C-alpha cells in the first residue's frame, strides 16, 4: 500500500481516524457496490448517507445535486442540476453500516453539521471542473 505524507495538511485537534481501516473497508465496498455515474465522464460517486428510507435520494441527479459553474467564456456562473435539501441526509446507507465509515460518520456528525456525504472516485489524471457547491 502506498503511504502518503500529510505534513502539509491541516490537522483538526482531537480528531484522528485510521486511514488503513478506511482503505480496507473502502476496498470491500468497491468490490460489492456498483456506483452510478449519471452521464458524467470520469465521475463516480458512492453515497454514504441518504434521506431516511428514500432510496431515490441516492440515485440519478441526487448523486450530484445542484452546483454552479462557469460554463462558457462569458464568465457568468450558471446553476446546474437539481436542488437538494442536504439537511435531510441523516441515515447511513446500509452498505456502510458494518464498516469503519460508520464510526467516522457518527464521530463527525457529533462535531459538525453534515449534509450529503459521499465518496468521489476519480480516474488518474482527471479532475472536476471548477465549480461551487451550495452551502448547507
Stretches found by the model and what they are:
Residues 107-111, 116-119:
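A short, contiguous structural element within a folded domain that forms the immediate neighborhood
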Residues 118-135:
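Conserved short histidine dyad/triad with adjacent acidic residue
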Residues 1-106:
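Non-heme Fe(II)/2-oxoglutarate
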Amino acid at each position: 500500500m502506498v503511504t502518503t505524507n500529510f505534513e502539509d495538511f491541516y490537522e483538526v485537534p482531537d480528531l484522528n481516524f485510521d486511514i488503513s481501516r478506511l482503505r480496507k473497508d473502502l476496498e470491500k465496498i468497491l468490490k460489492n457496490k456498483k456506483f452510478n455515474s449519471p452521464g458524467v465522464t470520469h465521475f463516480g460517486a458512492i453515497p454514504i448517507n441518504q434521506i431516511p428510507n428514500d432510496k431515490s435520494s441516492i440515485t440519478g441527479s441526487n448523486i450530484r445535486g445542484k452546483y454552479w459553474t462557469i460554463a462558457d467564456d462569458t464568465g457568468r456562473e450558471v446553476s446546474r442540476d437539481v436542488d437538494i435539501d442536504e439537511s435531510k441526509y441523516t441515515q447511513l446507507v446500509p452498505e456502510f453500516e458494518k464498516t469503519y465509515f460508520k464510526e467516522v460518520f457518527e464521530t463527525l456528525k457529533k462535531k459538525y453539521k453534515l449534509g450529503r456525504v459521499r465518496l468521489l472516485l476519480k480516474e488518474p489524471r482527471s479532475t472536476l471542473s471548477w465549480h461551487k457547491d451550495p452551502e448547507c
